[in-house]
């Protein structure tokens, strides 16, 4: 099976992140599937803010092209609940749903998982994302309960580290 999996760079020289580590582990330990890594997210030394606009637009074009080239692939979408990723990733996930492709959303913690006060826009986006009819995977049973209680998600499973 072809699986498109999103994560920042898997090169530890470029990016030291929990998401990258988990994705690398998944790819390295599931040889029966063909993984297509789609690099999404900034590198550790890369500037953020407005400097991310052009790379993001380029990534959107590449993402659309990849989805059209691999319509039968399963998308394993890595989703950290941080301010920037909530806004960015909701658009990428919407494109997957619009193509009618199967998707699993793998939640990788983040500030908004435990924050009491989430800005209105991000809260609306999160509620919309977690209402999608796709399976969600969290890294612990505590995260599963939090996602269900806080965002109303229905289909959430635990895949502990």
Task: Place the predicted regions along the sequence by residue.
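Glycine-rich, highly charged phosphate/nucleotide-binding loops
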Residues: 51-67
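N-terminal subdomain of nucleotide-sugar transferases
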Residues: 1-44, 70, 100
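Membrane-proximal helix-turn-helix segments that form the acceptor-binding/catalytic region
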Residues: 92-102, 119-135
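Donor nucleotide-sugar binding/catalytic pocket of nucleotide-sugar-dependent glycosyltransferases
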Residues: 126-127, 131-161
């Amino acid at each position: 099976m072809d699986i498109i999996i999103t994560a920042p760079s898997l090169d530890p020289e470029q990016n030291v992140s929990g998401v990258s580590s988990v994705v690398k582990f998944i790819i390295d330990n599931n040889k029966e599937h063909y993984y297509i890594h789609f690099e999404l997210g900034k590198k550790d030394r890369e500037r953020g803010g407005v400097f991310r606009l052009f790379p993001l637009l380029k990534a959107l074009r590449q993402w659309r092209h990849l989805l059209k080239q691999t319509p039968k692939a399963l998308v394993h979408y890595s989703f950290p609940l941080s301010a920037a990723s909530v806004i960015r990733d909701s658009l990428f996930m919407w494109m997957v749903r619009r193509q009618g492709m199967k998707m699993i959303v793998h939640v990788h913690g983040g500030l908004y998982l435990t924050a009491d006060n989430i800005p209105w826009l991000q809260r609306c986006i999160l509620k919309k994302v977690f209402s999608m009819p796709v399976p969600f995977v969290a890294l612990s049973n505590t995260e599963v309960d939090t996602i269900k209680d806080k965002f109303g998600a229905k289909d959430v499973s635990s895949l502990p580290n």
